[in-house]
């Protein structure tokens, strides 16, 4: 995404993290404390239109009219706390899809986890890999590929080769560039046409956010999908 430098910054809710290359400050966002946003910025809307064409891994129907893009890091404790809330949210809202934007910013080995997940996606095994990686304790390593492949029913040789491929690196770099452009300095961060929310959002608040997305879409305000 080519764009000017971001003009807004998200509110810091808590700090766990480090400075990574390029000067991006990475942290894990604490549990949600701010009110729900009333709408997305122009930059966020532009991103949502572009992200709909990026073939991001998806939870839910690929053609669902409501879209929530999740920026996350496998080392983020609040991402781990949020993760089990998403399948029941999508099950309760069949018009919703969650797009996963791998955002490995907290530790150097976070990128290894993201590469393994996207390599699993190439074999149609993203969601099982996503769940498995969140259950890992400690550091991520390419030595985990055989265990991951066995757990999710993937080809380990193909997994190892794909995770080192240029398309995987490009996809992760694209997510990092987009997040920095948007001013996302913490995980988890969720974007929709209603705006951005951060942190370990409890299920009732997630449902409220989805209901606001649906209401806006029904009213013809900020459509969720590009024409």
What are these regions (language model features)?
Residues 3-25, 150-227:
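C-terminal cap of thioredoxin/glutaredoxin-like
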Residues 29-47:
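N-proximal helix/coil linker or "cap" segments that precede and/or mark the start of modular domains
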Residues 46, 56-57, 101-103, 132, ...:
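Flexible, active-site-adjacent loop/turn segments at secondary-structure boundaries
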Residues 48-66:
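A short beta-strand-turn-helix
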Residues 49-51, 81, 171:
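Short secondary-structure boundary/capping elements
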Residues 53-57, 84-85, 176-178:
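A generic local structural motif
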Residues 61, 70, 199:
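Conserved strand-loop elements at the edges of beta-sheets that form or border functional pockets
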Residues 64-75, 80-151, 182-185, 216, ...:
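Structural alpha/beta surface segment adjacent to cysteine/selenocysteine redox centers
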């Amino acid at each position: 995404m080519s764009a000017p430098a971001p003009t807004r910054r998200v509110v810091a809710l808590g700090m766990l993290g480090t400075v990574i290359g390029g000067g991006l400050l990475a942290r894990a966002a604490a549990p949600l404390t701010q009110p729900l946003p009333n709408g997305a910025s122009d930059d966020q809307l532009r991103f949502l239109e572009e992200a709909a064409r990026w073939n991001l891994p998806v939870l839910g129907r690929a053609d669902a009219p409501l879209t929530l893009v999740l920026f996350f890091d496998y080392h983020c404790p609040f991402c781990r706390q949020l993760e089990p809330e998403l399948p029941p949210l999508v099950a309760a809202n069949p018009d919703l899809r969650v797009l996963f934007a791998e955002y490995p910013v907290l530790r150097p080995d976070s990128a290894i986890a993201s590469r393994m997940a996207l390599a699993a996606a190439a074999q149609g095994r993203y969601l099982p890999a996503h769940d498995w990686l969140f259950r890992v304790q400690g550091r991520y390593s390419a030595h985990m590929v055989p265990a991951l492949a066995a757990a999710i029913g993937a080809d380990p040789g193909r997994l190892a080769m794909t995770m080192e491929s240029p398309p995987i690196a490009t996809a992760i770099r694209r997510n990092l560039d987009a997040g920095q452009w948007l001013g996302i300095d913490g995980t988890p961060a969720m974007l929709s046409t209603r705006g951005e929310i951060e942190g370990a959002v409890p299920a009732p608040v997630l449902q409220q956010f989805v209901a606001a997305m649906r209401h806006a879409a029904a009213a013809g305000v900020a459509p969720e999908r590009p024409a």
